[in-house]
């Protein structure tokens, strides 16, 4: 199972993204493509344009979370038929986490700024569940609560052999910061393994903002990125083999 997550920066360089998908071998045979900051160009969803470039065997779903400077900003999932046969995808709102669980300074900040609308896409089949997430830029404990909303949703669903949570966590700041360790502890407590933990940078600022988590039994994985200059984020890949040794 090959998974890629990529914040495509509102598709500002959509032609470069399409070129990469068509020409780079890393995208060949991709099973799941999780997109953040997907937009609409020429009346078409970015995900539709990218899926078309990937070939006839791909399907897509895109949902707008908010308008960013008047442009649609949302999440999308592209999947390869045969590798994944989901029912109709659903939206999980990440907009209203529990403020009472946050420090007072952070609660004050979040009330003062214009609210950000954030969502996760959930797609599932009897064999697999996938979440495409995009957490807020602002806030620390806020991000933990947004991610916890995904974890809570997953826990309420029937158990499946494989769950993938992938996306842009916006984890700006030193990787050893206590709050980022809290985020890592939250996912670990839920049985989610960060298969991209060895990757050092996923953004032009040289920070790691993007990740892929896996919840399963025994599995092996490897992860890598490409520096394509088609977005401010790098695409992040993981090959996951269930039952591997």
Question: Model-derived features: where do they sit?
Answer:
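Active-site beta-strand/loop signature of hydrolases that rely on acidic residues for catalysis
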Residues: 2-8, 21-46, 78, 129-134, ...
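Acidic-and-aromatic substrate-binding clefts and catalytic sites of carbohydrate-active enzymes
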Residues: 10-15, 39-43, 67-70, 139-141, ...
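Soluble or luminal CAZymes and related metallo-dependent hydrolases
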Residues: 12-17, 42-46, 113-117, 141-149, ...
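Short aromatic-enriched loop/helix-cap "lid" or pocket-rim segments at secondary-structure transitions
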Residues: 16-18, 45-48, 72-74, 101, ...
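Structured beta-strand-rich core segments of catalytic domains in phosphoester-bond hydrolases
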Residues: 32, 36-127, 226-227
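Alpha-helical structural signal in soluble globular domains
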Residues: 49-57, 153, 182-186
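Metal-dependent phosphoester-hydrolase catalytic domains
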Residues: 83-89, 141, 145, 154-164, ...
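Internal catalytic-core helix/loop-beta-alpha segment
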Residues: 109-124, 131, 136-140, 144, ...
């Amino acid at each position: 199972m090959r998974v890629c997550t990529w914040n495509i920066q509102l598709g500002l360089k959509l032609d470069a993204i399409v070129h990469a998908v068509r020409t780079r071998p890393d995208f060949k045979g991709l099973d799941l493509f999780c997109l953040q900051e997907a937009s609409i160009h020429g009346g078409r969803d970015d995900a539709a344009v990218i899926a078309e470039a990937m070939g006839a065997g791909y399907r897509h779903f895109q949902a707008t979370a908010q308008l960013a400077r008047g442009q649609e900003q949302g999440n999308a999932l592209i999947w390869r038929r045969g590798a994944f046969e989901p029912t109709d995808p659903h939206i999980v709102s990440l907009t209203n986490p529990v403020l009472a669980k946050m420090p007072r300074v952070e609660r004050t900040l979040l009330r003062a700024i214009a609210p950000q609308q954030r969502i996760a896409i959930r797609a599932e089949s009897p064999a697999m569940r996938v979440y495409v997430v995009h957490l807020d830029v602002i806030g620390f404990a806020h991000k933990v609560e947004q991610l916890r909303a995904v974890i809570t949703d997953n826990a309420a669903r029937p158990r499946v052999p494989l769950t993938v949570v992938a996306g842009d966590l916006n984890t700006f700041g030193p990787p050893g910061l206590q709050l980022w360790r809290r985020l890592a502890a939250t996912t670990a407590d839920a049985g989610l393994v960060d298969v991209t933990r060895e990757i050092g940078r996923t953004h032009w600022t040289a920070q790691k903002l993007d990740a892929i988590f896996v919840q399963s039994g025994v599995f092996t994985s490897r992860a890598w990125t490409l520096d394509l200059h088609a977005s401010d984020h790098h695409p992040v890949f993981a090959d996951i083999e269930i039952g591997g040794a």
